[in-house]
Amino acid sequence: MFLVIGAILAGALFVGLLLYQLKFKRLIDLISYMPGPPVLPLVGHGHHFIGKPPHEMVKKIFEFMETYSKDQVLKVWLGPELNVLMGNPKDVEVVLGTLRFNDKAGEYKALEPWLKEGLLVSRGRKWHKRRKIITPAFHFKILDQFVDVFEKGSRDLLRNMEQDRLKHGDSGFSLYDWINLCTMDTICETAMGVSINAQSNADSEYVQAVKTISMVLHKRMFNILYRFDLTYMLTPLARAEKKALNVLHQFTEKIIVQRREELIREGSSQESSKDDADVGAKRKMAFLDILLQSTVDERPLSNLDIREEVDTFMFEGHDTTSSALMFFFYNIATHPEAQKKCFEEIRSVVGNDKSTPVSYELLNQLHYVDLCVKETLRMYPSVPLLGRKVLEDCEINGKLIPAGTNIGISPLYLGRREELFSEPNSFKPERFDVVTTAEKLNPYAYIPFSAGPRNCIGQKFAMLEIKAIVANVLRHYEVDFVGDSSEPPVLIAELILRTKDPLMFKVRERVY
């Protein structure tokens, strides 16, 4: 009996391995034309990344592209997993500009325990319908109301910066921690309509849970040892993730239930206008309110549906904005002439009274600040790598790409290509001035918010928040970099772009 069972299992294993080998051989044959570094059996190119510090991975990918790629296309094997890296805007346009490659790469699965099937990771019909109902949440009338939240959050940030200025003086301090708490405050209030007061209560259970999940995601997505569920679930990291997820999901669920009950009592669900242009015009609304009043196929969204999107909004609008702001302050601190122009523009638009609140109209007049933000995102895109999954054999500009391939596109790499941007390692905000510049920019060379149908739905929200915080900080302080400005920061291209070492700043009060 046991011999029969053993023989059946052995036979099944043999057949499985045979089928896998045939499939793998087919993949190798189909992709044999594509250049790539020398490969090792079983691990592929994994030995270049396993056990290496994160900042070394960025250098290695750039080195591979410069050394081995042909027409800016390169294959990289991570074990049996085929990855194709693309750095030609013509290829990028095909991948991002159509719905043929609408599915995210396998690395995004690490996000599913928190975001479930939210807009970032959903696909097909569900993605299309969710995108349609969420788009009105970023109408200018609603963004106008969100500026009040940005104003409040940035004022709290100023108080914390003043404390650190008095405490540390010329020795400097890291802006990132305060900026990160500021963006957490603003994203919570705009997403759910509640204040978590992260800047005054950084040790709260919710704030710590967000930090834990951010740490887990970075490790899972870019550490091969954590990528396999069977081994990952046995680690302390998995237990920390489970605990943090319980906190986050329970918090969001509680807010959803409370707000749904309030809307029922108010009768808002029946009275609100269905016209996109009127959404949010009558009353200040959070992202959550819009979801609670939305329907898909004439049915209201469930609490789980709403939680997926609120959590996605929280994730996408928190660390990304913090990263952009940190690199913005680094750029203007190391380019005093740009900082001076930003300050003069802010002062001329907002006025001499530092207590004057910023507004939607005023922020849209900050033209030079806008150029500096765009140039910062070219040099230091918050999301350094985008991924798509190929579901069936296809051709991209004559290049055969097999089903199952992960396509990797790096906004960081594209933004540093000399063929696409003159002096790519120099901070030149004027390159984005469509009025004065002679430099023609390829729309698929500059993709800090991705591009095409799956581009970042909240990019206008992000730009407004960044400019609101910048306007208030620069009205009050002159920002100086504490460090060697002749050496660029060492980058870590994880889920969100970071630096190997904290960027340190000192601030001086502006008197005028």
From Swiss-Prot:
Q: What is its main location?
A: endoplasmic reticulum
Q: Name one GO cellular component term.
A: endoplasmic reticulum membrane
Q: What class of enzyme is it?
A: oxidoreductase
- Record-listed heme binding positions: E316, C456
Record's bilayer topology term: Peripheral membrane protein
Q: Which Pfam families match?
A: p450 (PF00067)
Where is it located? Endoplasmic reticulum membrane; Microsome membrane
Family named by the database record:
Belongs to the cytochrome P450 family.
Q: What is this protein's function per UniProt?
A: Involved in the metabolism of insect hormones and in the breakdown of synthetic insecticides.
Q: What is the name of the protein in this document?
A: Cytochrome P450 4d1
Q: Which organism is it from?
A: Drosophila simulans
Q: Which gene encodes it?
A: Cyp4d1
